[in-house]
């Protein structure tokens, strides 16, 4: 009797154990779909990005017109460009839902998987930021200037560091060239770290909605979850194509249709929607260094999640107090996103400060306390 090649061949065996015969909990819901959707987004972004890079020119005198050339003259260039731009938005939608699922169901207790995932978030944010600079429109240029300038808040080495990143005394040709290099390089580092993320996940197996050990009831990934994921994939692609074909500029900034001009500042400098919550936290602190630290901590706080878990139960499924706090956190993030896109004036300033305080209070203080109270209620 001949043995199955997919179970014996060194390469096929890895794929088989990761995507075909992988034992999966039988009760995982559609919230466990986002991992495969993120993998799809990454592949899609890499393919469209490579095709864009074939026609893009990373010189300040050519960058803006090369993007216009892609949109007008390249076969399906408009489609590739719009899919890449809106694909980034979709990528972040999936990331935030994936992280939200992880927090709700206590997936962060798989520390290695969680920490590599948080590192992936940082890398993805860096990639999106340098990518946003490439079209060399007004918002590209000023976002690059403002965000890189934040590093000057670092004591002693700040100014030197900023000039080193700029490659000169202002955002210029050298900056654009290196940002293009980083934007091309980082997705491949993300791919490598994604492999590590999966490696750690498959060491422990997936969590499930109950948070209990599911070893007694596992089913193979294929055909059950490969088909279940296919539904999510079709819905995601339908959403992406609707966005790309009917509302291609809905999530973009109109200022970016104006070529970069160092002599004219846009009335409201703001990043893409997926960074607005962090931008609101940055702006809510009147001190430059304090703002930068708060901005960093708003993401770094995810690394602390496993240490802040006080409950005897893993998921939030059966913990009403923590559930209220979780949904308050989601509402708070939506408020921060709205505030990040508003001008710095009352009442937006004070709302932003209150929302920022609430964000850190929920994650660092209220959730751990709620966990302890729930333990007391159980005992």
Curated annotation (Swiss-Prot):
<keyword id="KW-0830">Ubiquinone</keyword>
<feature type="binding site" description="axial binding residue">
    <location>
        <position position="197"/>
    </location>
    <ligand>
        <name>heme b b566</name>
    </ligand>
</feature>
<dbReference type="InterPro" id="IPR005797">
    <property type="entry name" value="Cyt_b/b6_N"/>
</dbReference>
<protein>
    <recommendedName>
        <fullName>Cytochrome b</fullName>
    </recommendedName>
</protein>
<feature type="transmembrane region" description="Helical">
    <location>
        <begin position="227"/>
        <end position="247"/>
    </location>
</feature>
<keyword id="KW-0249">Electron transport</keyword>
<keyword id="KW-0496">Mitochondrion</keyword>
<keyword id="KW-0408">Iron</keyword>
<keyword id="KW-1133">Transmembrane helix</keyword>
<feature type="transmembrane region" description="Helical">
    <location>
        <begin position="348"/>
        <end position="368"/>
    </location>
</feature>
<feature type="binding site" description="axial binding residue">
    <location>
        <position position="84"/>
    </location>
    <ligand>
        <name>heme b b562</name>
    </ligand>
</feature>
<feature type="transmembrane region" description="Helical">
    <location>
        <begin position="78"/>
        <end position="99"/>
    </location>
</feature>
<keyword id="KW-0472">Membrane</keyword>
<feature type="binding site" description="axial binding residue">
    <location>
        <position position="183"/>
    </location>
    <ligand>
        <name>heme b b562</name>
    </ligand>
</feature>
<keyword id="KW-0999">Mitochondrion inner membrane</keyword>
<dbReference type="InterPro" id="IPR005798">
    <property type="entry name" value="Cyt_b/b6_C"/>
</dbReference>
<dbReference type="GO" id="GO:0006122">
    <property type="term" value="P:mitochondrial electron transport, ubiquinol to cytochrome c"/>
</dbReference>
<dbReference type="GO" id="GO:0005743">
    <property type="term" value="C:mitochondrial inner membrane"/>
</dbReference>
<dbReference type="InterPro" id="IPR027387">
    <property type="entry name" value="Cytb/b6-like_sf"/>
</dbReference>
<feature type="transmembrane region" description="Helical">
    <location>
        <begin position="321"/>
        <end position="341"/>
    </location>
</feature>
<keyword id="KW-0479">Metal-binding</keyword>
<keyword id="KW-0679">Respiratory chain</keyword>
<dbReference type="InterPro" id="IPR036150">
    <property type="entry name" value="Cyt_b/b6_C_sf"/>
</dbReference>
<dbReference type="Pfam" id="PF00032">
    <property type="entry name" value="Cytochrom_B_C"/>
</dbReference>
<feature type="binding site" description="axial binding residue">
    <location>
        <position position="98"/>
    </location>
    <ligand>
        <name>heme b b566</name>
    </ligand>
</feature>
<comment type="subunit">
    <text>The cytochrome bc1 complex contains 3 respiratory subunits (MT-CYB, CYC1 and UQCRFS1), 2 core proteins (UQCRC1 and UQCRC2) and probably 6 low-molecular weight proteins.</text>
</comment>
<dbReference type="InterPro" id="IPR016174">
    <property type="entry name" value="Di-haem_cyt_TM"/>
</dbReference>
<dbReference type="Pfam" id="PF00033">
    <property type="entry name" value="Cytochrome_B"/>
</dbReference>
<feature type="transmembrane region" description="Helical">
    <location>
        <begin position="289"/>
        <end position="309"/>
    </location>
</feature>
<comment type="function">
    <text>Component of the ubiquinol-cytochrome c reductase complex (complex III or cytochrome b-c1 complex) that is part of the mitochondrial respiratory chain. The b-c1 complex mediates electron transfer from ubiquinol to cytochrome c. Contributes to the generation of a proton gradient across the mitochondrial membrane that is then used for ATP synthesis.</text>
</comment>
<dbReference type="InterPro" id="IPR048259">
    <property type="entry name" value="Cytochrome_b_N_euk/bac"/>
</dbReference>
<keyword id="KW-0812">Transmembrane</keyword>
<feature type="transmembrane region" description="Helical">
    <location>
        <begin position="114"/>
        <end position="134"/>
    </location>
</feature>
<feature type="transmembrane region" description="Helical">
    <location>
        <begin position="179"/>
        <end position="199"/>
    </location>
</feature>
<dbReference type="GO" id="GO:0008121">
    <property type="term" value="F:ubiquinol-cytochrome-c reductase activity"/>
</dbReference>
<feature type="binding site">
    <location>
        <position position="202"/>
    </location>
    <ligand>
        <name>a ubiquinone</name>
    </ligand>
</feature>
<feature type="transmembrane region" description="Helical">
    <location>
        <begin position="34"/>
        <end position="54"/>
    </location>
</feature>
<keyword id="KW-0349">Heme</keyword>
<comment type="similarity">
    <text>Belongs to the cytochrome b family.</text>
</comment>
<keyword id="KW-0813">Transport</keyword>
<dbReference type="GO" id="GO:0045275">
    <property type="term" value="C:respiratory chain complex III"/>
</dbReference>
<dbReference type="InterPro" id="IPR048260">
    <property type="entry name" value="Cytochrome_b_C_euk/bac"/>
</dbReference>
């Amino acid at each position: 009797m001949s043995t199955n090649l997919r179970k014996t061949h060194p390469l096929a065996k890895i794929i088989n154990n990761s995507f075909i015969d992988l034992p999966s909990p039988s009760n995982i819901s559609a919230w466990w779909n986002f991992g495969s959707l993120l993998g799809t987004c990454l592949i899609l972004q890499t393919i469209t990005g490579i095709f864009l890079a074939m026609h893009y020119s990373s010189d300040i005198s050519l960058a803006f017109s090369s993007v216009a050339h892609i949109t007008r003259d390249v076969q399906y260039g408009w489609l590739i460009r719009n899919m890449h731009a809106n694909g980034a938005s979709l990528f972040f939608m999936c990331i935030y839902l994936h992280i939200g699922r992880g927090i709700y169901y206590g997936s962060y207790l798989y520390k290695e998987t969680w920490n590599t995932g948080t590192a992936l978030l940082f890398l993805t944010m860096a990639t999106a930021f340098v990518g946003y600079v490439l079209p060399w429109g007004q918002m590209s240029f000023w976002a690059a200037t403002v965000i890189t300038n934040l590093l000057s808040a670092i004591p002693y080495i700040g100014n030197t560091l900023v000039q080193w990143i700029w490659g000169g005394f202002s955002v210029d040709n050298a900056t654009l060239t290196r940002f293009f290099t980083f934007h091309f390089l980082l997705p491949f580092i993300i791919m490598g770290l994604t492999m590590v993320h999966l490696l750690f996940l498959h060491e422990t197996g997936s969590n499930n909605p109950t948070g209990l050990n599911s070893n007694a009831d596992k089913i193979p990934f294929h055909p059950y979850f490969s088909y279940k994921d296919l539904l999510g994939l079709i819905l995601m692609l339908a959403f992406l194509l609707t966005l790309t074909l009917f509302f291609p500029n809905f999530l973009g900034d109109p200022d970016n249709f104006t070529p970069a001009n160092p002599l004219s500042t846009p009335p409201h400098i703001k990043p893409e929607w997926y960074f607005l919550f962090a931008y609101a936290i940055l702006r809510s602190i009147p001190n430059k260094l304090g703002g930068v630290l708060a901005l960093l901590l708003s993401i770094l706080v995810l690394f602390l999640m496993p240490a802040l878990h006080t409950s005897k139960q893993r998921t939030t499924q059966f913990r009403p107090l923590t559930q209220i706090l979780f949904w308050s956190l989601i509402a708070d993030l939506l408020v921060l996103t709205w505030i990040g896109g508003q001008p710095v004036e009352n009442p937006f300033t004070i709302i932003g400060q209150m929302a920022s305080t609430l964000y850190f209070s929920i994650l660092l203080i209220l959730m751990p306390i709620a966990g302890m109270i729930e333990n007391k209620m159980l005992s």
